[in-house]
Structures are given as structure tokens and as C-alpha cells.
Amino acid sequence: MATPWRRALLMILASQVVTLVKCLEDDDVPEEWLLLHVVQGQIGAGNYSYLRLNHEGKIILRMQSLRGDADLYVSDSTPHPSFDDYELQSVTCGQDVVSIPAHFQRPVGIGIYGHPSHHESDFEMRVYYDRTVDQYPFGEAAYFTDPTGASQQQAYAPEEAAQEEESVLWTILISILKLVLEILF
């Protein structure tokens, strides 16, 4: 007789834990961020969905892959960014976050790519306006110069470019291997 009550109590506790976790996920957004939009969608493997952002200022895109793996590509020079034509990207498994600087030309193109490792991907993207004001929007080095000229910083990190190229190559290689395996079997 106590077993059904224990099961019911465990179910109630489990639902409370799930609710608490969901609340904590939503609360980890800084107070300075203002939620503008919530976009939900579904994307097929190897396909793109495109969105356009017209809001001015610093914008934060937080996309969660609910099922599968959706990747995020952003550009202010093309309305259809892709994995080989973008300015900003986030290609993680799970939550993707991209911070769009205020100086990006509007409209900003947003490409959501369904990774080929999953037949379909469901995603939810939250668009936030960041109300914080950068004291030095181009970095402190842009405003204060060393009179001796001894400290020159490189604006471009070659390690990052090599890592991005490597990521694209791995994606292409995996896609080719899947295609070969699909043909053989």
C-alpha cells in the first residue's frame, strides 16, 4: 500500500526537479539582456534556414538544438551565410551562442544549418538585445597606444582560421564517408 504513494511522491519530486532545472536555464541570462524574439523551427540534414535581423545595437543569439544538431552562421555581408561564407559562427552540439556587434551593417543574415549527422534537427533560438555599453567598443588597445611602439597586437589569429578550416574539412569528410557507406550498404 505504501508503494503506490512512494511512486506518486517520486513522480511529483521528479517533476519539481525538471521544473526547477528549466527555470534555472532561463535565469542564467544577465539582467542587461532584453528578450526580443523566440524563434522555433525544424531543419533537414544538410539544409539551411535563413533569417534576417534588422535590430540595431549589440544582439545576442542563443540557439538550443532540441533534437539533432543545428549550427548557426551569421554575416553582415551576405543575406545567406553558410559554412564557407560567414563572419560569425557557432557550431557546437547543444547550445550555440553568437554575439553580433553593434557595428555590423543591418540587415544581418542568419543561417541555420541542419548538420548531416541527424535526419532532422529541431531548434529554439532566443534573440536578446544587450543593453550594456562597452567602454571601449574596439578594445582598449585601440584607444591607448604605446609611445615606443613596442607592443603591437595581431588583429588576426591564424590558429583560429586553421581551426575553422579544419572544422569545415571534418564536416565534408564525414559527409563523404556517410555517402560512401550509404552507397555500399
Curated annotation (Swiss-Prot):
Signal peptide (residue range) = 1-23
Name the domain of life: Eukaryota
Location in the cell:
Secreted
UniProt entry tagged with the keyword Mitochondrion:
no
> Which UniProt key words apply to this protein?
Apoptosis, Glycoprotein, Secreted, Signal
Enumerate the InterPro entries for this protein: UPF0669
Q: Which GO BP terms apply?
A: apoptotic process
Q: Does the keyword Signal apply?
A: yes
Q: Which family does it belong to?
A: Belongs to the UPF0669 family.
User: Can you say what this protein is called?
Assistant: UPF0669 protein C6orf120 homolog
Q: From what organism does this protein derive?
A: Mus musculus
The lineage is:
Eukaryota, Metazoa, Chordata, Craniata, Vertebrata
